[in-house]
């Protein structure tokens, strides 16, 4: 009986660690896909890493420090972003100070993504606002699936400033006349868009022709 009890405990432990590892794997892959779609230089080799390869590299209990990602923008070398995976504990203001000091000591970045597994305190959120660059917060559960790949989601394309200007001129309208898209929309957060940026949204239906609309982030 004692032996069986031990076997159950061990099995449960292995299962729990496997789930944890798989969660990190999925979230990191989605994050790299997200960076690539934003124009950052991320290799296909990193994105296509299998779960087995991920386990071989990082183990069943990955060290979050080793999961960090840094990438430069393909078309603007002055833009560099870092991704930091926070641990399972509550993120307090002291943790934010440590992250800030560590990131800034390593590299000169223009953006930071924090992947959270637990609650972040109000004081820590206030500390985030003091950073000199844009900081984005994502729950790890929001990154287990790539929202841009959902079969029911229409195709989204981010317009650059020139394309936006041409659009407004073509239809003789002002930015405020465009349909709005909330800054909290998952696809807006995925692309890291700012207020005023415009997305081209293409809807496709098997029974009808594709329909295109433009929406402005508010």
Swiss-Prot record:
- Primary subcellular site in the record, as a coarse category: nucleus
Coiled coil ranges: none
Q: Origin, by domain of life?
A: Eukaryota
One biological process term from GO is: DNA-templated transcription
Q: What InterPro entries does this protein's entry cite?
A: Arch_Rpo5/euc_Rpb5, RNA_pol_Rpb5_N, RNA_pol_Rpb5_N_sf, RNA_pol_subH/Rpb5_C, RPB5-like_sf
Assigned keywords, A-Z: DNA-directed RNA polymerase, Nucleus, Transcription
Q: Localized where?
A: Nucleus
- GO CC: one term? RNA polymerase IV complex
Q: Name one GO molecular function term.
A: DNA-directed RNA polymerase activity
Q: In which tissues is it expressed?
A: Expressed inleaves, flower buds, flowers and siliques.
Q: What does this protein do?
A: DNA-dependent RNA polymerase catalyzes the transcription of DNA into RNA using the four ribonucleoside triphosphates as substrates. Component of RNA polymerases IV and V which mediate short-interfering RNAs (siRNA) accumulation and subsequent RNA-directed DNA methylation-dependent (RdDM) transcriptional gene silencing (TGS) of endogenous repeated sequences, including transposable elements.
* Binding partners and assembly: Component of the RNA polymerase IV and V complexes. Interacts with NRPD1.
Q: Which family does it belong to?
A: Belongs to the archaeal Rpo5/eukaryotic RPB5 RNA polymerase subunit family.
The name on file for this protein is DNA-directed RNA polymerases IV and V subunit 5B
């Amino acid at each position: 009986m004692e032996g069986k009890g031990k076997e159950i405990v061990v099995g449960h432990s292995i299962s729990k660690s496997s789930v944890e590892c798989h969660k990190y794997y999925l979230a990191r892959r989605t994050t790299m896909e997200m960076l690539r779609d934003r124009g950052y230089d991320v290799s296909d080799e990193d994105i296509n890493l299998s779960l087995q390869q991920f386990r071989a590299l990082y183990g069943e209990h990955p060290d979050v420090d080793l999961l960090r990602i840094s990438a430069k923008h393909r078309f603007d070398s002055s833009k560099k972003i870092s991704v930091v995976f926070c641990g399972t504990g509550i993120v307090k203001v002291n943790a934010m100070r440590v992250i800030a000091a560590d990131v800034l000591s390593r590299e000169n970045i223009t953006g930071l993504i924090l992947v959270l597994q637990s609650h972040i305190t109000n004081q820590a959120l206030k500390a985030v606002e003091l950073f000199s660059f844009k900081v984005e917060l994502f729950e790890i559960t929001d990154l287990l699936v790539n929202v841009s790949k959902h079969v029911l989601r229409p195709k989204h394309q981010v317009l650059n400033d020139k394309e936006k200007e041409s659009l407004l001129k073509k239809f003789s309208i002002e930015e405020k006349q465009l349909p709005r898209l909330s800054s909290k929309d998952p696809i807006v957060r995925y692309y890291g868009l700012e207020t005023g940026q415009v997305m081209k949204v293409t809807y496709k239906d098997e029974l009808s022709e594709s329909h295109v609309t433009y929406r402005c982030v508010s």
